[in-house]
Amino acid sequence: MSDEQSTPASGRPPRQSRGGLTSTGARKAASKSNRSRAREFALQALYQHLVGGNDVEAIDRFTRDLSGFHKADSVHYDALLRGCINSQVDLDALIAPKLDRTMAEISPIEHASMWIGVYEFQHCPDVPWRVVLNECIELAKEFGGTDGHKYVNAVLNGLAPTLRAAEVEHDRAGKGSAPAQPAAKADTATDAVADAATDAAAADDAADQAAG
Protein backbone atom coordinates (compact mmCIF):
# COMPACT_ATOMS: atom_id res chain seq x y z
CA MET A 1 0.00 0.00 0.00
CA SER A 2 1.45 3.40 -0.98
CA ASP A 3 1.90 6.37 1.36
CA GLU A 4 -0.99 8.12 -0.39
CA GLN A 5 -3.30 5.21 0.49
CA SER A 6 -2.31 4.89 4.15
CA THR A 7 -5.01 5.24 6.79
CA PRO A 8 -5.46 8.84 8.03
CA ALA A 9 -5.30 9.78 11.70
CA SER A 10 -9.07 10.29 11.74
CA GLY A 11 -9.55 6.52 11.57
CA ARG A 12 -11.63 6.68 8.37
CA PRO A 13 -10.26 4.73 5.40
CA PRO A 14 -8.93 6.95 2.59
CA ARG A 15 -11.52 8.33 0.20
CA GLN A 16 -9.33 7.89 -2.89
CA SER A 17 -9.29 4.09 -2.73
CA ARG A 18 -12.78 3.56 -4.10
CA GLY A 19 -11.48 0.80 -6.32
CA GLY A 20 -10.42 -1.27 -3.30
CA LEU A 21 -7.42 -3.61 -3.24
CA THR A 22 -5.85 -4.43 -6.57
CA SER A 23 -6.85 -7.81 -7.98
CA THR A 24 -4.60 -9.88 -10.22
CA GLY A 25 -7.64 -10.83 -12.28
CA ALA A 26 -7.10 -14.52 -11.54
CA ARG A 27 -10.82 -15.10 -11.94
CA LYS A 28 -13.02 -13.39 -14.49
CA ALA A 29 -15.69 -11.20 -12.94
CA ALA A 30 -18.43 -12.93 -14.90
CA SER A 31 -17.59 -16.27 -13.27
CA LYS A 32 -17.94 -15.01 -9.70
CA SER A 33 -21.00 -15.79 -7.62
CA ASN A 34 -22.60 -13.23 -5.34
CA ARG A 35 -21.03 -14.97 -2.37
CA SER A 36 -17.61 -14.95 -4.02
CA ARG A 37 -17.95 -11.20 -4.42
CA ALA A 38 -19.07 -10.92 -0.79
CA ARG A 39 -15.88 -12.69 0.29
CA GLU A 40 -13.78 -10.31 -1.80
CA PHE A 41 -15.33 -7.24 -0.21
CA ALA A 42 -15.09 -8.81 3.25
CA LEU A 43 -11.40 -9.47 2.59
CA GLN A 44 -10.85 -5.84 1.66
CA ALA A 45 -12.70 -4.67 4.77
CA LEU A 46 -10.77 -7.04 7.03
CA TYR A 47 -7.54 -5.86 5.42
CA GLN A 48 -8.42 -2.31 6.48
CA HIS A 49 -9.08 -3.56 10.00
CA LEU A 50 -5.81 -5.49 10.22
CA VAL A 51 -3.64 -2.76 8.73
CA GLY A 52 -5.24 0.37 10.16
CA GLY A 53 -7.30 -0.82 13.10
CA ASN A 54 -10.20 1.24 11.79
CA ASP A 55 -13.64 1.24 13.39
CA VAL A 56 -15.85 -1.46 11.88
CA GLU A 57 -18.64 0.98 11.06
CA ALA A 58 -16.26 3.28 9.18
CA ILE A 59 -14.80 0.32 7.32
CA ASP A 60 -18.26 -0.95 6.45
CA ARG A 61 -19.41 2.42 5.09
CA PHE A 62 -16.27 2.71 3.01
CA THR A 63 -16.50 -0.83 1.63
CA ARG A 64 -20.16 -0.59 0.70
CA ASP A 65 -19.28 2.46 -1.40
CA LEU A 66 -16.70 0.55 -3.46
CA SER A 67 -17.36 -0.11 -7.12
CA GLY A 68 -19.28 -3.34 -7.70
CA PHE A 69 -20.51 -3.86 -4.15
CA HIS A 70 -24.11 -3.99 -5.36
CA LYS A 71 -23.30 -7.31 -7.07
CA ALA A 72 -22.23 -8.95 -3.81
CA ASP A 73 -24.32 -10.90 -1.31
CA SER A 74 -24.46 -8.13 1.29
CA VAL A 75 -25.84 -10.42 4.01
CA HIS A 76 -22.91 -12.84 3.64
CA TYR A 77 -20.45 -9.94 3.47
CA ASP A 78 -21.84 -8.47 6.68
CA ALA A 79 -21.70 -11.83 8.47
CA LEU A 80 -18.06 -12.31 7.46
CA LEU A 81 -16.94 -8.79 8.32
CA ARG A 82 -18.59 -8.53 11.71
CA GLY A 83 -18.23 -12.20 12.56
CA CYS A 84 -14.49 -12.25 11.90
CA ILE A 85 -13.81 -9.01 13.77
CA ASN A 86 -15.94 -10.03 16.75
CA SER A 87 -14.32 -13.49 16.84
CA GLN A 88 -10.77 -12.53 15.90
CA VAL A 89 -9.22 -13.75 19.17
CA ASP A 90 -10.88 -17.15 18.85
CA LEU A 91 -10.04 -17.38 15.13
CA ASP A 92 -6.38 -16.60 15.79
CA ALA A 93 -6.30 -19.19 18.58
CA LEU A 94 -7.28 -21.84 16.02
CA ILE A 95 -4.95 -20.57 13.30
CA ALA A 96 -1.78 -20.00 15.35
CA PRO A 97 -0.98 -23.68 16.08
CA LYS A 98 -1.03 -24.41 12.34
CA LEU A 99 1.54 -21.71 11.54
CA ASP A 100 5.26 -22.25 11.18
CA ARG A 101 5.88 -18.58 11.98
CA THR A 102 4.39 -15.89 14.20
CA MET A 103 1.04 -14.32 13.39
CA ALA A 104 2.80 -11.00 12.85
CA GLU A 105 4.85 -12.55 10.04
CA ILE A 106 1.91 -13.48 7.82
CA SER A 107 0.57 -10.86 5.44
CA PRO A 108 -2.75 -9.11 6.16
CA ILE A 109 -4.20 -10.74 3.02
CA GLU A 110 -3.24 -14.23 4.18
CA HIS A 111 -4.49 -13.43 7.68
CA ALA A 112 -7.86 -12.15 6.45
CA SER A 113 -8.25 -15.11 4.06
CA MET A 114 -7.67 -17.51 6.94
CA TRP A 115 -10.16 -15.64 9.13
CA ILE A 116 -12.81 -15.95 6.43
CA GLY A 117 -12.09 -19.65 5.94
CA VAL A 118 -12.19 -20.53 9.63
CA TYR A 119 -15.32 -18.45 10.20
CA GLU A 120 -17.13 -20.16 7.32
CA PHE A 121 -16.02 -23.59 8.52
CA GLN A 122 -17.61 -22.79 11.89
CA HIS A 123 -20.70 -20.79 10.98
CA CYS A 124 -21.69 -21.56 7.37
CA PRO A 125 -22.51 -25.28 7.26
CA ASP A 126 -24.49 -24.77 4.04
CA VAL A 127 -21.20 -24.08 2.23
CA PRO A 128 -19.20 -27.30 1.58
CA TRP A 129 -15.78 -27.30 3.21
CA ARG A 130 -14.04 -27.73 -0.13
CA VAL A 131 -15.83 -24.65 -1.48
CA VAL A 132 -14.72 -22.63 1.55
CA LEU A 133 -11.15 -23.84 1.04
CA ASN A 134 -11.12 -23.12 -2.69
CA GLU A 135 -12.67 -19.67 -2.27
CA CYS A 136 -10.06 -18.64 0.30
CA ILE A 137 -7.26 -19.95 -1.92
CA GLU A 138 -8.66 -17.81 -4.74
CA LEU A 139 -8.80 -14.75 -2.48
CA ALA A 140 -5.14 -15.16 -1.63
CA LYS A 141 -4.28 -15.71 -5.30
CA GLU A 142 -6.14 -12.60 -6.43
CA PHE A 143 -5.03 -10.17 -3.77
CA GLY A 144 -1.97 -11.66 -2.08
CA GLY A 145 1.64 -12.46 -2.83
CA THR A 146 2.92 -15.06 -5.26
CA ASP A 147 2.76 -18.10 -2.99
CA GLY A 148 0.50 -16.84 -0.21
CA HIS A 149 -2.38 -19.01 -1.40
CA LYS A 150 -0.35 -22.14 -0.73
CA TYR A 151 0.09 -21.12 2.88
CA VAL A 152 -3.62 -20.32 3.26
CA ASN A 153 -4.43 -23.72 1.78
CA ALA A 154 -2.14 -25.60 4.14
CA VAL A 155 -3.52 -23.91 7.26
CA LEU A 156 -7.20 -24.25 6.33
CA ASN A 157 -6.72 -27.79 5.04
CA GLY A 158 -5.17 -28.59 8.41
CA LEU A 159 -8.13 -27.15 10.33
CA ALA A 160 -10.92 -28.63 8.23
CA PRO A 161 -10.73 -32.14 9.77
CA THR A 162 -11.40 -30.58 13.17
CA LEU A 163 -13.96 -27.93 12.25
CA ARG A 164 -15.84 -30.01 9.65
CA ALA A 165 -14.94 -33.46 10.97
CA ALA A 166 -17.86 -35.54 9.69
CA GLU A 167 -17.97 -33.83 6.30
CA VAL A 168 -14.24 -34.11 5.71
CA GLU A 169 -14.10 -37.74 6.84
CA HIS A 170 -16.97 -38.68 4.54
CA ASP A 171 -15.52 -36.73 1.63
CA ARG A 172 -12.01 -38.11 1.95
CA ALA A 173 -13.22 -41.66 2.48
CA GLY A 174 -15.12 -41.45 -0.78
CA LYS A 175 -12.46 -39.70 -2.84
CA GLY A 176 -9.25 -40.89 -1.23
CA SER A 177 -7.95 -37.37 -0.62
CA ALA A 178 -4.51 -36.95 0.86
CA PRO A 179 -4.24 -36.09 4.57
CA ALA A 180 -3.82 -32.46 5.61
CA GLN A 181 -0.36 -30.99 5.14
CA PRO A 182 1.41 -28.86 7.76
CA ALA A 183 2.05 -25.22 6.89
CA ALA A 184 5.75 -25.88 6.41
CA LYS A 185 4.87 -28.08 3.43
CA ALA A 186 2.47 -25.60 1.88
CA ASP A 187 4.22 -25.65 -1.50
CA THR A 188 2.97 -29.17 -2.20
CA ALA A 189 -0.50 -28.93 -0.70
CA THR A 190 -2.53 -26.91 -3.17
CA ASP A 191 -3.13 -28.67 -6.47
CA ALA A 192 -5.05 -31.80 -5.48
CA VAL A 193 -7.26 -29.99 -3.00
CA ALA A 194 -7.99 -27.10 -5.35
CA ASP A 195 -8.97 -29.48 -8.13
CA ALA A 196 -11.44 -31.27 -5.89
CA ALA A 197 -12.78 -27.98 -4.55
CA THR A 198 -13.55 -26.80 -8.06
CA ASP A 199 -15.95 -29.74 -8.45
CA ALA A 200 -17.89 -28.53 -5.40
CA ALA A 201 -17.99 -24.82 -6.23
CA ALA A 202 -21.37 -25.09 -7.94
CA ALA A 203 -22.92 -25.57 -4.51
CA ASP A 204 -22.08 -21.99 -3.61
CA ASP A 205 -23.79 -20.73 -6.76
CA ALA A 206 -26.83 -22.85 -5.92
CA ALA A 207 -26.95 -21.24 -2.50
CA ASP A 208 -26.92 -17.81 -4.15
CA GLN A 209 -29.84 -18.77 -6.37
CA ALA A 210 -31.82 -20.22 -3.49
CA ALA A 211 -31.24 -17.09 -1.42
CA GLY A 212 -32.38 -14.95 -4.34
From Swiss-Prot:
It comes from the Bacteria. Keywords: RNA-binding, Transcription, Transcription antitermination, Transcription regulation. One of its GO terms (cellular component) is cytosol. Gene3D superfamilies: NusB-like (1.10.940.10). InterPro entries: NusB-like_sf, NusB_fam, NusB_RsmB_TIM44. GO terms for molecular function: RNA binding. Pfam families: NusB. GO terms for biological process: DNA-templated transcription termination; transcription antitermination. Residues 178-212 have a biased composition (Low complexity). Residues 1-34, 169-212 are annotated as: Disordered. Belongs to the NusB family. Involved in transcription antitermination. Required for transcription of ribosomal RNA (rRNA) genes. Binds specifically to the boxA antiterminator sequence of the ribosomal RNA (rrn) operons. HAMAP family: NusB. NCBIfam families: nusB. PANTHER family: ANTITERMINATION NUSB DOMAIN-CONTAINING PROTEIN (PTHR11078:SF3), N UTILIZATION SUBSTANCE PROTEIN B-RELATED (PTHR11078). This is Transcription antitermination protein NusB.
